[in-house]
């Protein structure tokens, strides 16, 4: 039978039919178990748990056949007795749907719309057959090439360059768009690259050869200014380079392209064209400032990410502008919300310079209603009714600040991305999307049961905004492959938007394609002036040690820290995150509390939540209450320390290193983590790290080599893994050093801000170019999106109550 499967291509239903014939009783036993659960949804881990409960003999028969393959690939099972429907994912980005009648053992294949219709019956009961709005973006991309190999996911720009370079350079006529593109560049009224003396591709090639010949006769270091007038006369303007050597390199790159197009040469050349001088970065929600805000509601890793991003980006822009031979001053503006009630932060200040930069600022624009400016903080789940007016106000402020349009607009998170989409649409500017976290993935079943969560989270609005932005944008940056398409066993954040339903609102039969060439993996790093290895003793910030000693070991219990560590000789398990359900800090505390061996080996220190003031965040309040209960239930005082959120990043860097001194470990136990900046920070300091297998950390860490993956759904196993690590370290102290060094090596290879900023600017150039010379601006889909925005999103946003002032 194995040979049969290898030599014949069967549909999923046919393969299951064969297996049903051969293993009828075993399959019936399992499906009956699942059906007995009653009406509802089983996630992948629950389906596998049910499989593991059947007798071993039955399991063995099913494991190697088609049914075992289907079961391992099943991401969810919908139970509506006597039917069980399965969403099967043979590989990332590829989905098949089927349902089985458990009583008759009949298998049916389903289309995405049919599967979603069936799923909706969980909520709506038997459908009345009324028309349901179905969203399908696939027809708009039907004529556009897409890769099919998994290795192409997240490498969109390489695929695009390969495909379109061949198409663009195949004859003289096809070179006109490139010529037009090079002629349209100007800044503040000054023409760049080419002037109107060059009218056609033949003239361009002639001029380039003439310039190449001349540059071969002058010293490489000759400044551009010395031959600028000569070049202007033949049609070349500033922007090719700052000296003869650099200009010659650029000209030869273009000549090579015209002669024999090559995707790598194309990308290199486009990366040299002066295109990006003004960048706008949007992050409206939370308390966006540089000091004393980390740990405030909705204020965490995203703020750190953007500030580090901006510093690296400005450095790279200045470097490129100098190499291009220009004397232009770049601007980067971080657009966030102005908060008149700034509660001890700078969030009430309109313009604030970013530390460590020369030309980058935070520009704050308030939320506004007909009644005036909104003064207080608003949860990220409640910002939706303000954003359309906010976009108009931001456009007005940008015109004043930049005296023109930006060259790139970068959105962050759902609110920043929809504002970025509206601005890019209005201004005709290249748009980049960074999700950070898509809430649909963080809250399982939040689509099908959206009505239950609507009053608290307004997910109908947020999921609609996400869908709009990811389809509108020119390119999407993710930190990891996992964020796009998950892994063999887990669904990616973006992938979860391929097909889903919001019963009563609309049904998404094709929301996003993870193979779309707009996806690019560009991983950030940690600020290496703050986060550096604990072994670099000359750089260690020993002046912080008394304060850190107080935080960790003081016998005083107050609003800053409660519970004490009685045995200071033990290593410390350390974690630091927002105190919310998804970050799962209370989950880690419970794993620790339940495992006597782990408690014997190590202490646990948690930095999360702010006990110094009453939280406005309902989820944080609930997690605080849970934490107090765990301390009492497991009698943790003596082995556990709970520290309020720490906002001094520089001191936090040294705190990681002090944990290294105890030969401890960092644990990131999140239910789901899009990237895992704290994971990178900890590893950059040399701290062995255990992090969730759901999301980005699974990619950052090579399990067993540069750290360890833990499953937040199996806390007992995670605790046992920690026990195993610390027992090995006790027997062999070099084991700790081995994991620490491997973690550092992993960071140096892949996760630095310099690599990130170079990539972002190159992507902007490439997508800007392709948008100009092809149909990559996707005009048809944008018309569809305009209608979706006006008829669906706007009404949903208006339904969210305005915050009480």
Curated annotation (Swiss-Prot):
Catalytic activity: an NDP-alpha-D-glucose + D-fructose = a ribonucleoside 5'-diphosphate + sucrose + H(+)
Gene3D superfamilies associated with the record: 1.20.120.1230, 3.10.450.330, Glycogen Phosphorylase B
Source organism superkingdom: Eukaryota
UniProt keyword annotation of Flavoprotein present: no
Keywords: Glycosyltransferase, Nodulation, Phosphoprotein, Transferase
GO molecular function, one term: sucrose synthase activity
Pfam families, alphabetized: Glycos_transf_1, GT-B_Sucrose_synth, SUS_EPBD, SUS_N
Entry PTM: Phosphorylated on serine residue(s).
UniProt region (GT-B glycosyltransferase), positions on chain: 275-752
Transmembrane segments: none
Modified positions (Phosphoserine) in chain numbering: 11
One BP annotation, GO: sucrose metabolic process
EC assignment: 2.4.1.13
Function in brief: Sucrose-cleaving enzyme that provides UDP-glucose and fructose for various metabolic pathways.
Recorded family membership: Belongs to the glycosyltransferase 1 family. Plant sucrose synthase subfamily.
Assembly information from the UniProt record: Homotetramer.
Record protein name field: Sucrose synthase
Organism whose genome encodes this protein: Glycine max (Soybean)
Gene label: SS
């Amino acid at each position: 039978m194995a040979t049969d499967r290898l030599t014949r291509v069967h549909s999923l239903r046919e393969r299951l039919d064969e297996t049903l014939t051969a293993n009828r009783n075993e399959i019936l036993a399992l499906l009956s178990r699942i059906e007995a659960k009653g009406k509802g949804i089983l996630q992948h881990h629950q389906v596998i748990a049910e499989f593991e409960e059947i007798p071993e003999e039955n399991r063995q028969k099913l494991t190697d056949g088609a049914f075992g393959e289907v079961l391992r690939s099943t991401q969810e099972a919908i139970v509506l007795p006597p039917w069980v429907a399965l969403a099967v994912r043979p590989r990332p980005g590829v989905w098949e749907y089927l349902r089985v009648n458990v009583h008759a053992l009949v298998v049916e294949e389903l289309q995405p719309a049919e599967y979603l219709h069936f799923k909706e019956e969980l909520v709506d009961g038997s459908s009345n057959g009324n028309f349901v709005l179905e969203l399908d973006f696939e027809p708009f991309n039907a004529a556009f090439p897409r890769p099919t190999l998994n290795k192409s996911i997240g490498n969109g720009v390489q695929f695009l360059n390969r495909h379109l370079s061949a198409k663009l350079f195949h004859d003289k006529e096809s070179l006109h768009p490139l010529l037009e593109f090079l002629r349209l560049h100007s800044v503040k009224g000054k023409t760049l690259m080419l002037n109107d003396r060059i009218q056609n591709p033949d003239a361009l090639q002639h001029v380039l050869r003439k310039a190449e010949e001349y540059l071969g006769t002058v010293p490489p270091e000759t400044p551009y200014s010395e031959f600028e007038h000569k070049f202007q006369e033949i049609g070349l303007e500033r922007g090719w380079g700052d000296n003869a050597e650099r200009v010659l390199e650029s000209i030869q790159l273009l000549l090579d392209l015209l002669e024999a197009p090559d995707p790598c040469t194309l990308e290199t050349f486009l990366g040299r064209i002066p295109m990006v001088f003004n960048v706008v970065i949007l992050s409206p929600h939370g308390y966006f400032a540089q000091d004393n805000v980390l740990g405030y509601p909705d204020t965490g890793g995203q703020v750190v990410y953007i500030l580090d991003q901006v510093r690296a980006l400005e450095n790279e822009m200045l470097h490129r502008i100098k190499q291009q031979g220009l004397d232009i001053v770049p601007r980067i503006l971080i657009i966030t919300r102005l908060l008149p009630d700034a509660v001890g932060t700078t969030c009430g200040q309109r313009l604030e310079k970013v530390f460590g930069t020369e030309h980058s600022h935070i520009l704050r624009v308030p939320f506004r209603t007909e009644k005036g400016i909104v003064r207080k903080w608003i949860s990220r789940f409640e910002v939706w009714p303000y954003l359309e007016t906010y976009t108009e106000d931001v456009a007005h402020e940008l015109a004043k600040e930049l005296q023109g349009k930006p060259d790139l607009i970068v959105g962050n998170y759902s609110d920043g991305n929809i504002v970025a989409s509206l601005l890019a649409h209005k201004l005709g500017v290249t748009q980049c999307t960074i999700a950070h976290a898509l809430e649909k993935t963080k809250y399982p079943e939040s689509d099908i049961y959206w009505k239950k969560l609507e009053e608290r989270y307004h997910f109908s609005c947020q999921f609609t905004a996400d869908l709009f932005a990811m389809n509108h944008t020119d390119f999407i940056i993710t930190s990891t492959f996992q964020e796009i398409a998950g892994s063999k066993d887990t669904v990616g954040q973006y992938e979860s938007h391929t097909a889903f339903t919001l019963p009563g609102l609309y049904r998404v039969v094709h929301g996003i394609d993870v193979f779309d060439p707009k996806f690019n993996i560009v991983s950030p790093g940690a600020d290496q002036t703050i986060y550096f290895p604990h072994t670099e003793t000359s750089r260690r910030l020993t002046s912080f040690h008394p304060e850190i000693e107080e935080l960790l070991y003081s016998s005083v219990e107050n609003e800053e820290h409660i519970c004490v560590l009685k045995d200071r000789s033990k290593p410390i398990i350390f974690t630091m995150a927002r105190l919310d359900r998804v970050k799962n800090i209370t989950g880690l505390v419970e794993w620790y509390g339940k495992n006597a061996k782990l408690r014997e080996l190590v202490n646990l220190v948690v930095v999360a939540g702010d006990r110094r003031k009453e939280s406005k965040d309902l989820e944080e309040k609930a997690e605080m209450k849970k934490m107090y209960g765990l301390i009492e239930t497991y009698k943790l005082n003596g082995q556990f320390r709970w520290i309020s959120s720490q906002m001094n990043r520089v001191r936090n860097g040294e705190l990681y290193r002090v944990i290294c001194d105890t030969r401890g470990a960092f644990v990131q136990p999140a239910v789901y983590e899009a990237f895992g900046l704290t994971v990178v920070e900890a590893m950059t300091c040399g701290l062995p790290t255990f992090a969730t297998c759901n999301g980005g950390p699974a990619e950052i860490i090579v399990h067993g080599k540069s750290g360890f993956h833990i499953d937040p759904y199996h806390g007992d196993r995670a605790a046992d893994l920690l026990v195993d690590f610390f027992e090995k370290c006790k027997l062999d102290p070099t084991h700790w050093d081995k994991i620490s060094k491997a973690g550092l090596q992993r960071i140096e290879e892949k996760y630095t801000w310099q690599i990130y900023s170079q990539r972002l600017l190159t992507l902007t150039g490439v997508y800007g170019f392709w948008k100009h010379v092809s149909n990559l601006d996707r005009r048809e889909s944008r018309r569809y999106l305009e209608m979706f925005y006006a008829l669906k999103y706007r009404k949903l946003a208006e339904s969210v109550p305005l915050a009480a002032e």
